[in-house]
């Protein structure tokens, strides 16, 4: 049974998302109530998925409780009730992944790989692309940074999120000034790549966020890819902010890698993805040495796994 099938079953088992009783007037809570995590009864909206924190109340200095309004989605989204229910179903047969031959382990390993296949489809990856599970977007970008060929020069705008700005080898990184406009960004990028092509050799990688976590501005990914291709540069798309709002299609966009986090897509914290071309990842030293990263270990040598297992540990 696939995760998708389980999710559908869970959704059917959930109560209908209909209107709930209108919230009552603000009242003064007891001292014991303030010590606990308060909850509220609010009005639900038709067609809007429920989150685990939608009835959260916030105690005020005036000893009242007000509804919690989440304006922090760019940092982390609340988990969906359907996600919570699906996790609960999966936990009933949870066991080790690819580390056992027992019944529960085989079920969990199957779901794990089914989830990988679904992510592969979700991001529109090429057939030969790898999908590697990580902790979050920052972890994904650091994994790629550790996997770059030694001669790689990285190009990154100074306006990038710290995860995309700081992961790379400083001595091999070209920082592009904050652009004044979209057109300015394209001009600055091409100028940086042109100068590098005239003075250096080796691989090149352009790092770009699909959407700004500060302004919400959408970047012209296809135009950036077009410029990068002229200088034989690869492109990694930091889609942490883009994935929750726009369809991600690696093949259609022409990017080489994409990184994003589950906790910005209504899942709990602790899951991320790096998807993209396999060659650099298969040639690199394992990101996490041990566990499934080792295909064979003898006194004389260690043979590292290929594919996603090489870096998932």
Regions found by a protein language model. Give the residues of each.
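Pyridoxal 5′-phosphate
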Residues: 2-23, 27-313
């Amino acid at each position: 049974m696939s995760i998708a099938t389980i999710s559908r079953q869970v959704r059917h088992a959930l109560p209908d998302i209909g209107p709930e009783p209108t919230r009552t007037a603000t009242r003064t809570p007891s001292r014991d109530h303030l010590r606990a995590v308060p909850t509220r009864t609010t009005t639900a909206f038709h067609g809007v998925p429920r989150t685990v924190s939608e009835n959260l109340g916030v105690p005020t200095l005036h000893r009242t409780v007000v509804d919690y309004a989440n304006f922090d989605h760019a940092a982390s989204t609340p988990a969906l009730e359907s996600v919570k229910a699906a996790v609960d179903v999966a936990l009933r047969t949870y066991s080790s992944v690819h580390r056992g031959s027992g019944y529960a382990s085989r079920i969990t390993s199957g779901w794990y790989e089914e989830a990988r296949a679904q992510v592969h489809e979700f991001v529109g990856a090429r057939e030969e692309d790898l999908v590697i599970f990580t902790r979050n977007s920052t972890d994904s970008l650091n994994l790629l940074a550790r996997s770059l060929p030694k001669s790689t020069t990285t190009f990154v705008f100074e306006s990038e999120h710290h995860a995309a700005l700081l992961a790379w080898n400083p001595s091999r990184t070209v920082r592009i000034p904050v652009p004044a406009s979209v057109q300015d960004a394209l001009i600055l990028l091409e100028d940086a790549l042109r100068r590098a092509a005239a003075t250096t050799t080796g691989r090149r990688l352009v790092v770009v966020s699909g959407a700004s976590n500060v302004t919400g501005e959408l970047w012209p990914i296809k135009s950036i890819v077009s410029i990068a291709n002229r200088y034989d540069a690869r492109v990694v798309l930091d889609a942490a902010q883009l994935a929750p709002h726009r369809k991600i299609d690696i093949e259609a966009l022409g990017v080489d890698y994409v990184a994003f986090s589950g906790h910005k897509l209504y899942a709990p914290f602790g899951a991320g993805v790096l998807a993209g071309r396999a060659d650099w990842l298969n040639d690199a030293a394992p990101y996490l040495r041990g566990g499934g990263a080792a295909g064979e270990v003898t006194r004389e040598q260690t043979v590292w796994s290929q594919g996603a297992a090489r870096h998932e540990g």
